[in-house]
Amino acid sequence: MGSMGETHPTSIPTVDISPFLDVQASKEAKESVVTAMRDACSSFGFFYLVGHGIPEEDRQEILNCTKRYFDLPMEKKMETWIGKAMGRSFRGYEPPALQVHQEGLLPDTKEGFILGRETPADAPEAGTFHTGPNQWPKSLPDEEFSIPIMRYHAKMIEMVKVIVKVLALGLPAEWKCPLDVFDELTVNPSAPLRLLYYAPQPVKKENQFGVGDHTDFGNVSVLLQEEGTEGLEVFYPPTQTWVPVPVKPHSYVINMGDMMQKWTAGYYKSARHRVVNNNTKSRYSAPFFMNGNLDLKCHSLDGSGEVTVIGEHIRQRLMETIGGEAGKKLGL
């Protein structure tokens, strides 16, 4: 397996977080986790996470839910079209060709279904940016779709709470950051979960991808991929090469987003990545994005004085990838 110390790395690093879930783990074991995660995030910005404690049956159920949804006829999926979401809540079905991540590329081929924390329709904040009730397909029973999905969503939030504690411990000592420096971002956060489907693309186009070359907008992303499918690639700047990220059994792929890079003044890297289309095989995945509390003002931790409001940053990035009439319909 490749490592970041290699001139030409062949894979992203692996971090076993289990010592942080074990009350009897030694101080040395926890320190090794901090070092491994710090090194991965300050070089590549990506790593495999193992020892996370999420049961395999829970992970498989989410992939099953993903397949159930995308097996629906188009008219059923369009009943939950994202343009029907309350206000600017940005929930529901994302048809193919909705996003363009880079000038000169054709729109992404992926289909998506986006959901987040449930906010009642009568709540004062419902309908504001990234906040509101989820749209659930009437043709799928709750016990086969919404219930397992929201149970999994809650587990993702708890897992990221552990990850950001490790990230805080890995910050430069001279910054004198408190150990709870990232805790605020997980309080009432924007935390979308996207179910994604990449249909086979018999005709390969050089300027079209499942997801084009991009960086994630938020703080921490957690990707669940179906075994037996390929496509994700990460850009490694020192060698100017794309490194494949194949599915590793029982693991998640974790990456830092733009907001984390801003917050840490570039110490933790938000890496470019893309999904290359497969000619013959369908691909399913379920990325979870911890954007953070949308009202949180993040002061650059190196003391440089830069301040970024999470919600303003996320909205601006969405406007860059979903423009024109589609953006207007979605309240961007």
Give names to the regions the model predicted.
Residues 1-332:
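Peripheral, non-catalytic segments flanking oxidoreductase cores
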